[in-house]
A protein has these predicted regions:
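Acidic helix-start/capping segments at beta-turn-to-alpha-helix junctions
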Residues: 99-118, 191, 196-206
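Sec-dependent N-terminal signal peptides
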Residues: 3-13
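Bacterial Sec-dependent signal peptides at the C-terminal "C-region" and cleavage site
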Residues: 13-22
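Active-site acidic/histidine clusters and adjacent loop/turn architecture
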Residues: 35-104, 169-186, 191-192, 196
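Envelope-exposed proteins and targeting segments
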Residues: 98-100, 123-127, 233-237
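Soluble periplasmic/extracytoplasmic beta-strand elements of cell-envelope proteins
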Residues: 103, 126-132, 196, 238-240
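Acidic/His-rich structured neighborhood in mature extracellular/periplasmic domains
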Residues: 96, 109-160
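Catalytic cores and adjacent binding grooves of peptidoglycan-active enzymes
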Residues: 23-25, 137-244
């Protein structure tokens, strides 16, 4: 937990040191957008849908934070209330198995609908999660701070960063997270409908101890993607959820 605590201290210091990223502004935005207590309703599909009474994810927690203030203040961090609840529970449960810090990326608009440039994310049941990284086999966070530009980072087919091969994807951490998301979702009567990750990275994912468990669970990880979509899912993994 020492790494997580230090990360939060640095995060809060940086927020307080700049106007747009100030903790006060984040807190005010969150407060202003959490007054709707009506139940969430997801309509349609992730690629053609809408969302009633979407709930805003807290910008940061004890071991995670949202990845970009511009995205957050633009209303792109809303979810169906059940998805929000089990996503936060999974982060809480991760504290028992890892001292890593995690980043959540784009979710849905408050009322769903098209979320450019994503093809999905339309009804509050889709989330992008930032790939956790290591450098020289230790947790590495420097690339977590670049905001929306993170979507354009490039990793090779073995999960190594194109600009520095000592930086690589932590596949064990990803598998641990997905397993705990699945467990928390099941408890709420939901399941993971689809996990999207660059196809060439699947072998690396399944080779880890938790990855073997993930494969045994039968959680669907995409079998094929278009060339463009495949190339865009090396810096993050996308998950669609659905009610059982």
């Amino acid at each position: 937990m020492k790494i997580v605590t230090l990360f939060l201290i640095v995060f809060c210091f940086n927020c307080c040191s700049s106007g747009q990223d100030s903790v006060d502004k984040i807190r005010k935005y969150y407060t202003d957008h959490t007054i709707d207590n009506l139940p969430s309703i997801s309509h349609g599909s992730v690629s053609n849908g809408s969302l009633d009474h979407g709930k805003l994810i807290p910008y940061y927690g004890s071991n995670y934070s949202y990845f970009d203030t511009t995205s957050y203040f633009s209303g792109r961090a809303f979810l169906h209330e059940d998805v929000l609840a089990f996503t936060l529970k999974a982060y809480k449960n991760l504290e028992n198995v890892s001292n890593r810090f995690y980043r959540i990326m784009e979710c849905s608009n408050q009322m769903g609908g098209k979320l450019w440039p994503h093809q999905t994310h339309q009804n509050g049941t889709s989330i992008d999660f930032m790939m956790p990284l290591t450098k020289d086999h230790k947790p590495y966070y420097n690339l977590d701070e670049i905001g929306l530009s993170h979507y354009w980072l490039s990793f090779d087919d073995n999960g190594k960063y194109s600009e520095d091969k000592s930086v690589e994807i932590d596949f064990e951490a990803i598998a641990q997270h997905i397993l705990l998301l699945n467990e928390a979702a099941n408890e709420k009567g939901w399941k993971l409908k689809k996990v999207i990750i660059k196809i060439e990275l699947k072998d690396e994912l399944y080779a880890t101890p938790s990855g073997k468990k993930l494969k045994a669970k039968g959680i669907y990880v995409v079998q094929g993607l278009s060339k463009m979509v495949n190339a865009l899912h090396d810096d993050h993994y996308h998950i669609d959820f659905t009610k059982v």
